[in-house]
From Swiss-Prot:
This is Hopanoid transporter HpnN. The lineage of its organism: Bacteria, Pseudomonadati, Pseudomonadota, Betaproteobacteria, Burkholderiales. It comes from Burkholderia multivorans (strain ATCC 17616 / 249). Residues 302-428 form the SSD domain. It holds the Pfam family MMPL. InterPro entries: Hopanoid_biosynth_HpnN, MMPL_dom, Mycobact_MmpL, SSD.
Amino acid sequence: MVTSLIVRLVAWSVRRPVWVVVLSLLIAAFSGVYVARHFKINTDISKLVDAEPQWAALSQAVDRAFPQRNGTILAVVEAPAPEFATAAAHALTESLQKQAAAGRIGPVAEPGGGPFFEHNGLLFLSPQQVADTTSQLASARPLVNELAKNPSLTGLATTLSTTLGQPLLTGQVKLPSMAKLLSRSAATVDDVLAGKPAAFSWRALVDNDAARQPARAFVTVQPVVNYGALKAGAQTSDVIRETARALDLEKRYGAVVRLTGEQPLADDEFSSVEDGAALNGVVTLLVVFVILWLALRSKRMIASVLVTLFVGLVVTAALGLAMVGSLNMISVAFMVLFVGLGVDFSIQYGVKYREERFRDERIDHALIGAAHSMGMPLALATTAVAASFFSFIPTAYRGVSELGLIAGVGMFVALLTTLTLLPALLRLFAPPGESKTPGFPWLAPVDDYLDRHRKPILIGTLAVVIGALPLLAFLHFDFNPLHLKDPHSESMSTLLALKDSPEAAVNDVTLLAPSLADADAAAKRLDALPEVGRTTTLSTFIPADQPEKRAAIATAASTLLPALTQPPAPPATDAQRVAALKRASDLLGYAAEDHPGPGAAAAQHLSQSLAKLAAADSATRDRAERAFADTLRIALNQLAALLQPQEITRDTLPPPLVRDWVAPDGKALVQISPKVPKGVDPNDDTMLRHFATAVKAAEPGAIGGPISILHSANTIISAFLHAALWSIISITILLWITLRRFGDVLRTLVPLLVSGIVTLEMCVVLGMSLNFANIIALPLMLGVGVAFKVYFVMAWRAGQTGLLHSSLTHAVLFSAATTATAFGSLWLSHHPGTSSMGKLLALALTCTLIGAVVFQPVLMGKPRVKRAKNQSQGINE
């Protein structure tokens, strides 16, 4: 009945080709207008997975209470010295706050910086650390006084000369204790002389953490997002970069601003997908043209196939938008699917038409004969493929669910256009007749070999596949989405550089507590877990033992503030600067000779460097002035601020800081960071899994970070398992209804399952992990695999033998080559996730093709009935 309907449909199209073509083009035109007016793509990746109500409620509660924390952009200010990094971050923050007031961007903050931390930083040390620090500062009063009196290159050279005089001779100062100062000074002068970015950090002399290069400071910006654009946060990122350029931070401080955070990571991900897409698309199209030529051997046939594909694709796009409203970053892949499988249908019909045309020159008869031969296989393949795609609709993975809906409908569109528009176009274009039947006659000996050794090959294949099943225990799912991002993109490279920095907070999880008291209690419980490295609440910003600390700071301030606030000396002339540098160079040389041992080499090095600086031009000395004196002035101002702390209470905390940790309704946030053992990668999957499990067990309300990622991974894996189960059940029922023989159903499904199992086994052998991106390849290959298996089992049921060198294999191989080109081009993508999907698609397609072309004929054996004589020509029985 189905075959009869298809033959009548094709016959009707062949008799009225002009009407069919005109009607198809009109439908395509209307569909194109609809797509142009309604095309939308939602780039919000948080909407790709439908969370369970409980999980969604936890996440939404945090987002409602602290909306300013969602999708933040972290601007990382890098400079040669921490003094410059801090100053550049201050300047950037002040300027961006004006942009925020104008509504161009969201709220701006400076985590760990700003007036609050500048004045109260010492209060966050322990009482003993405060006592030691203030004692050292007080004993350094003479040096501080000299530096503050003349904070210039001349003043520094003079102070160094003074220190190398009487204090060194009397033993008050020892050369080894000056080694760090001298060696770092020499390195900075050398950078100045070499024309490199240079800055001398005074903080780094007493703080080893400040000596890390490059020095960093941070600014957070809440982006204004547009999920209708490919890069939703691009506007805010552009404002930040424009502001940094306008401030000339690189010239003033040697500072560079790099952006990372949730939104820049998403934006750069889409950029990496887009990068090279045009070139890959052109190359792919050219390769597809070549494959179509090899398969069809006719320009007119190729033109007919391409027009059919275009019409079907536009109609599918219109139907897809009508069904789902807007595409997402996964469902947009329906285009690749449609091209891959749409070409398959067209090639199957086209190759069969060529075979029929070889036997009968009459084009009408050949077109109808091809429909009679391929109508039922195409209809069954279409329905089976659509069923496999529709199996994803009930799952919680919305991205793939919508892809399954659109792709499934698209299969029926592809079938309809293949059986109407394609025959009509071929009738109008009237390709020339065929001189030989399609196929691979040179593969006939292989067919004979497989037929003679069927049982050993079958048993050996199944033994290898079953024997390798234990490998599946080592199949790894990489749940970390950061591994799917381009490590060379600005946002990802910056994040990797920050992997040991608490400001990145990539792997932190959060807990929303009813009050600050509850948050503090939860933090105390979580601190006891060995997997937890640090917890933070608003109370973290209210230091303990403040009276004791403030008293120690006040004692130091009484001696140091008068020196720090004295008016500086007037600027020296360049001649005075040269004289001071020469004197310091000479004294350093004498000190190195008179005090051999530790520190002498550094003194000699600096002596030579200062001599070169004195002999250089004034512009070089001006750069040295900025490298030493500018950072000194900033450091002295920071020291003066640190010596003037305020009492910190809940009421005196800055309102923006309070708002980041306590909501207006009193709910409070706990931020929990993992404990990273020494030598372990902060993004290690096993460590993060243990951390997430421990925190979730202790506090079921915890959400975010690895907890949310693991939940999403479990949801996606569950979605694919359920979809695979429903797909197999639906395909089995469909095959049973159509084939009416349980053995024939197994002859279709067993090669499909074997191909899938071998694909996963090869993933283990080749070290390929499954991830959020490439797992999508499995249902795609399920659809392609079902189609191939159906073609072969239907040909076998019709009595066809010698399948390997038949026109069917000719069509399947070139169809697979086209699909491989469409899918395999993803392998060349700059985006690691897309590239991994291309790799898995290539592997899965290879396994599927071998399963269909080689294993399935061996499994089926000789057909039950001989092929009808009128269909046997051109086929080696």
